[in-house]
Design a protein with these regions (language model features):
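Ferredoxin-type iron-sulfur electron-transfer modules in oxidoreductases and energy-metabolism complexes
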Residues: 1-14, 37-65, 69-71, 79-114, ...
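A broadly conserved sequence feature marking short terminus-proximal activation segments
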Residues: 1, 21-45, 285-289
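Residues immediately within or flanking Cys/His clusters that coordinate Zn2+
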Residues: 19-29, 63-73, 186, 278, ...
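Iron-sulfur-cluster electron-transfer modules
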Residues: 19, 36, 46-188, 192-224, ...
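Cysteine-centered loop/knuckle micro-motif
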Residues: 31-32, 75-77, 362
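Cofactor-cradling patches in redox/metallo enzymes
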Residues: 157-248, 282-299, 303-395
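C-terminal amphipathic alpha-helical segment
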Residues: 252, 260-297
Length: 395
């Protein structure tokens, strides 16, 4: 036993000291979607931390299976930031020279290219080829100055499976005649570095680079389609600058909520459909944005929303967070499959989300399980309904 283990861990981050107040109620284990993949349940892990059983805790590696979804944080009666302490354990593991194959490769890619896939910067924009734009129209996407910047994020930019998300947002913004542009030199927001055991301070260069790129555009608003990017911009980046951000960061659901109204599809003859909505953990639970996506759906004629058993800030994770797909893809798929089961219970024809990674993870699980449900991002569904009516977006 190492009786200093608890004290050292408690001092690493503000709030960590609350682990000393854990009463072993088990709400964390009952809330954890990843506990099946842990040799020590969350409850047992925290007890071992309290008892100074450092070797057992660090040897279990269960902290790498945490999706950092934050449901345990929300339900803990003592208000212990458990997902934050999971990240502290990853940092301790990293400082001790430990490594995890999937994480190591991703961090190497980020160092070399500024994105998780190690791709050339130009490849972030291959999805634009399918928009059917003229050379002039394509060039306008990268104009020097604009009121709005669309920060795409690595998953939407580099995974063809979800290329429809940035395509849909660009189409909608162009319909709205929004003065917007993309960042030619966009980097990853940096979350995979923090989630990879390097700590929040490791995001400084990502913050400085992306903030400077946005400010060079003179933008007042940044729209994101990745909730994790949103979280990093609003909760982590401000720590590295001595003044407030000069621009407002919004998820696309917030931006479009006031623009997409019932006028869009009034009197339309589109087919009536039932949809269910999966709340991304970072957007719904951590940033408390649950109404905006639903208000957009309410503004679409012929659309009925059927809620899953766990929704809103109590929504279950898709299994795609916390770098889990890099460290334990099988567990990630199993978690996503359970969420598909929740969606099927509603009888909905569509399972919608507003996160690029959720869309990937859930669609992979639906295909694997041959589930009879269409997985789409809210943006893709919105554009589909607008195009079915042949009407312009109301503004």
């Amino acid at each position: 036993m190492n009786f200093d283990f608890l004290d050292i861990l408690s001092r690493e981050k503000e709030g960590n000291e609350k682990i000393k107040t854990c009463i072993q109620c088990g709400s964390c284990t009952g809330s954890c979607v990843a506990s099946d993949g842990m040799s020590l349940s969350p409850r047992k892990l925290w007890r071992n931390v309290q008892m100074g059983m450092e070797a057992d805790v660090m040897g279990s590696l269960g902290f790498w299976n945490c999706t950092t979804c934050g449901l345990c944080d929300k339900r803990c009666p003592r208000g212990i930031p458990l997902s934050q302490i999971m990240l502290s354990l990853r940092e301790k593991f990293d400082r001790a020279g430990g490594s995890v194959a999937g994480i190591t490769q991703t961090l190497d890619n980020l160092r070399k290219s500024g994105n998780i896939m190690g791709e050339d910067a130009a490849n972030r924009f291959l999805w634009i080829d399918n928009l059917g734009l003229t050379e002039k129209e394509r060039g306008e996407l990268f104009k020097g100055k604009s009121e709005v910047v669309y920060f795409i994020g690595c998953v939407g930019a580099l995974f063809p499976q979800v290329g429809g998300i940035p395509q849909s947002l660009v189409k909608i913004l162009r319909k709205l005649k929004t003065d917007f542009s993309l960042l030619e030199n966009e980097w990853c927001c940096g979350y995979p570095v923090m989630g990879g055991g390097k700590g929040a301070d490791s995001l400084r260069e990502y913050a400085e680079h992306n903030i400077a790129a946005i400010e060079s555009k003179g933008a007042k608003t940044v729209i994101v389609s990745c909730p994790t990017c949103y979280y990093i911009f609003n909760k982590v980046y401000p720590k590295f600058i001595d003044k407030p951000l000069s621009f407002n960061v919004m998820h696309y659901a917030e931006y479009l909520e006031g623009l997409i109204t019932d006028k869009c599809l009034a009197g339309s003859e589109t087919k009536s459909v039932t949809v269910t909505y999966h709340d991304p953990c970072d957007l719904g639970r951590k940033l408390h944005i649950t109404d905006a996506p639903r208000n957009i759906l309410k503004g679409l004629s012929g659309v009925t929303l059927a809620e899953m058993r766990f929704s809103g800030e109590e929504g279950k994770c898709c299994g795609g967070g916390g770098n889990l797909e890099m460290t334990n893809s099988e567990l990630s798929l199993n978690i996503a499959s359970k969420r598909i089961g929740d969606a099927l219970e509603t009888g909905a024809e569509y399972l919608l989300s507003s996160c690029q990674q959720c869309r990937r993870t859930l669609q992979n699980a639906a295909r694997k399980g041959r589930a009879r449900i269409k997985v789409m991002d809210l943006l893709e569904f919105l554009l589909l309904r607008l195009e079915e009516t042949g009407k312009e977006v109301a503004k």
